[in-house]
UniProtKB/Swiss-Prot annotation:
<dbReference type="InterPro" id="IPR015946">
    <property type="entry name" value="KH_dom-like_a/b"/>
</dbReference>
<protein>
    <recommendedName>
        <fullName>Ribosome-binding factor A</fullName>
    </recommendedName>
</protein>
<dbReference type="GO" id="GO:0005829">
    <property type="term" value="C:cytosol"/>
</dbReference>
<dbReference type="GO" id="GO:0030490">
    <property type="term" value="P:maturation of SSU-rRNA"/>
</dbReference>
<keyword id="KW-0690">Ribosome biogenesis</keyword>
<dbReference type="Pfam" id="PF02033">
    <property type="entry name" value="RBFA"/>
</dbReference>
<dbReference type="InterPro" id="IPR000238">
    <property type="entry name" value="RbfA"/>
</dbReference>
<comment type="function">
    <text>One of several proteins that assist in the late maturation steps of the functional core of the 30S ribosomal subunit. Associates with free 30S ribosomal subunits (but not with 30S subunits that are part of 70S ribosomes or polysomes). Required for efficient processing of 16S rRNA. May interact with the 5'-terminal helix region of 16S rRNA.</text>
</comment>
<comment type="similarity">
    <text>Belongs to the RbfA family.</text>
</comment>
<dbReference type="InterPro" id="IPR020053">
    <property type="entry name" value="Ribosome-bd_factorA_CS"/>
</dbReference>
<dbReference type="InterPro" id="IPR023799">
    <property type="entry name" value="RbfA_dom_sf"/>
</dbReference>
<keyword id="KW-0963">Cytoplasm</keyword>
<comment type="subunit">
    <text>Monomer. Binds 30S ribosomal subunits, but not 50S ribosomal subunits or 70S ribosomes.</text>
</comment>
<dbReference type="GO" id="GO:0043024">
    <property type="term" value="F:ribosomal small subunit binding"/>
</dbReference>
Length: 131
């Protein structure tokens, strides 16, 4: 069995190309600092789900606005990809907001809170034993 599947290689290549294209070629002022966090390509290479994050922005309205800009530019992006990557058929691009980063930050803050609470309890217990 092969080490890497073709869909994985295509997804990696799409991620690299889209990251460059979004930053350099889309001139829409509504577009924020978009990062392509991952790309998943269907087995038949018919479509690609592109997951993005926005640097420093978690507002739902801004996220929707950025997704709207990217969805509007998907034809342009697809044609640019066709010029850069040798594929018989360039997958249809479907953009999604990647909530895993936000969830990860939330989990991290919950862990930090739990550790701080535990330390406070430990300090309170130590003070009670001293008395």
């Amino acid at each position: 069995m092969r080490e890497f599947k073709r869909t994985d290689r295509v997804a990696d290549q799409l991620q690299q190309e889209l990251a460059v294209l979004i930053q350099r070629e889309i001139k829409d002022p509504r577009l924020g600092m978009v990062t392509v966090s991952s790309v998943k390509v269907s087995r038949d290479l018919g479509y690609a789900d592109i997951y993005i994050t926005l640097l420093g922005e978690n507002d739902a309205a801004r996220i929707d606005e950025n997704l709207k800009v990217l969805r509007h530019a998907r034809g342009f992006l697809r044609s640019q990809i066709a010029n850069r990557i040798k594929l018989r058929h360039v997958p249809e691009l479907r953009f999604h907001y990647d909530e895993s980063v936000v969830r990860g930050q939330r989990l991290s803050s919950l862990i930090d809170e739990a550790v701080a609470d535990d330390r406070r309890r430990h300090e309170d217990d130590d003070e009670d034993e001293v008395r």
